[in-house]
Amino acid sequence: MGDLLSNSEFFKKLGVDSSNQWILYDEQMEMFFKFLSGNITDANILTERQVLEREEMQRRGEWLSASDRELKLLQIEAESPGLLNYKQQDVDALTMSIEAIEDASRDYATLLEDMMTTKHSITKHLGEVECVTAELQLREKDLIAECQSKAKQLEELQQENCRLSAEAKKAFTAPQLPPLFMHQLPLEQYFHKCDSFMQYFTLYVKENFKIQDYDEFQSAEEDLGREKAKLEDLERGIQFYALSYIRTKAKVKATQCLIDQLDLGKIHCLSLTDMAREMHDLQLLNDYQLSNTHDTLLNDLTIHIQQHTQRRIELVLYENTKLKLERAVRRHESDKKLTKIISDALSNAELLWIAIQLDCDKKRNCLDTSEELRDQAQATWQRIQTMRSINASYQGICAQFVQEIANLLSAHLGQNIKATEAKACLFEYEKFGRLLSYSFQSMLNRKSCAAVQDQLAELKRLEQTLRPFVYDSPLEQPMFENVRYLSAIYNVTQQQTRLDESGRSLRKDFLENVVGRIERDKLYRYSVVLWIWFLTEPQRMMHAIDEVKKAAAAVIRPGGGLHRK
């Protein structure tokens, strides 16, 4: 018995000193001590801390009696059914679930940091693209201003050519004073007058018919080619950035899908307050992330549409400017050719008329019987015969002249003019001159400046729109320190209007597709709020499950196999 008491684990747990044993050394107590050592474990022995806590609770009056403990246990069971039946395995499972949720939260925070980094990089890249676009817009404005100045210069040159043509026509059609019929004068004076007239005529043609070569049009065309190449490079760059933007958007959407896959209905929390607080934090974080993602995507889409519209406008303006320059160059070339033809024709006609007058004067002086006069008369007769032969047969210079006029008229009129008769060519030329005069009159009446007037009207409208931003003072004068912010203010106003419209449409879609569906569809409402009822109101959850079972039983299911009537 002494060995039993000295080697008993029961007394060691109780802290009894084996050297001072007060237990009776009786063999009948052996079974009693064995029973006690088999039934008393570490869980049944109060520790010193537990004893102190009990004394403290008794001192504060918080220690419950047996009946009070039974009532408290019933209350806890009523508030949380099955809570007292949980074992250590259930507690371990809930602990593992909480650890898994914490790991998922850390992964979600890391993913959010990556998304913010990606957002900052995309914003920086879009800012660089906006800077490049603004630079190209400035270049486009400079090019348009240069084209407008070239068009104005060309218009002034055409007006000057029209004036000079009218003066030349007046000079050759009006009667000359003094008359050129000087057959009463001697031949020496007549020849002297003819030489002076030819010199005057040559000087007049050189001074008034100046044909200039406009090399600057070629340089402008080369500049347009270079600008077109730059615009094409910019378009390819925008396509590349749009592809990268689509990839980033797909990555964001995939991440959102992964986040949506988290089934919060399977999460069981040990404490309702902790679960509610965690749910509130996750909801705030999710709402903030969704708002940031929506704003980012909306801004990116707006900027992309704006860039696409600006690029289309730039291309249209470039094509219109190119067509105008081509028409101006063709008109200039046609004016040069027509000026040359008219000048050559007038020169030939004047020379022929002078030769005829000389022949007439020499015929009138036929009374002179000198050898020189006889030689002159023979030469004049030969010239007259040559002119008659040329008039009789459309060969030589006249045929070449008629053929050249026919070719030029065909090129200008877009019709095939046959060089059979000079009258037909003259008729077509007269028709062409009439159309040309109509074109000159329309140009002088400013009908060709309709596009410029429309642009001026648009500029005036923009001026009236932006005037409150410029004249923001009691005085009627612009505040120059704020002028550089006007474009940004205008763009922000437009973006705010578009954002308001998008917000209204988004709110309308949410009310129609989410709130309206929750109010109309009972089963959809149960699927949304069932996990909330599971945590807060179990009775409503059981009622919802019964309603779903009734709805499922009401659905007609097709039977399998053959059925006998």
Swiss-Prot record:
Residues 135-171, 212-241 form a coiled coil. It holds the Pfam family HAUS-augmin3. Its main location: cytoplasm. One of its GO terms (cellular component) is cytoplasm. InterPro entries: HAUS3_N. GO terms for biological process: cell division; mitotic spindle assembly; mitotic spindle organization; mitotic spindle-templated microtubule nucleation; regulation of mitotic nuclear division. It is found in: Cytoplasm, Cytoskeleton, Spindle. Keywords: Cell cycle, Cell division, Coiled coil, Cytoplasm, Cytoskeleton, Microtubule, Mitosis. It comes from the Eukaryota. GO terms for molecular function: protein-macromolecule adaptor activity. Belongs to the HAUS3 family. As part of the augmin complex, plays a role in centrosome-independent generation of spindle microtubules. The complex is required for mitotic spindle assembly through its involvement in localizing gamma-tubulin to spindle microtubules. Component of the augmin complex composed of dgt2, dgt3, dgt4, dgt5, dgt6, msd1, msd5 and wac. The complex interacts directly or indirectly with microtubules and is required for centrosome-independent generation of spindle microtubules. The name 'dim gamma-tubulin 3' derives from the decreased gamma-tubulin staining of the spindle pole seen following RNAi-mediated knockdown of dgt3 in S2 cells. This is Augmin complex subunit dgt3.
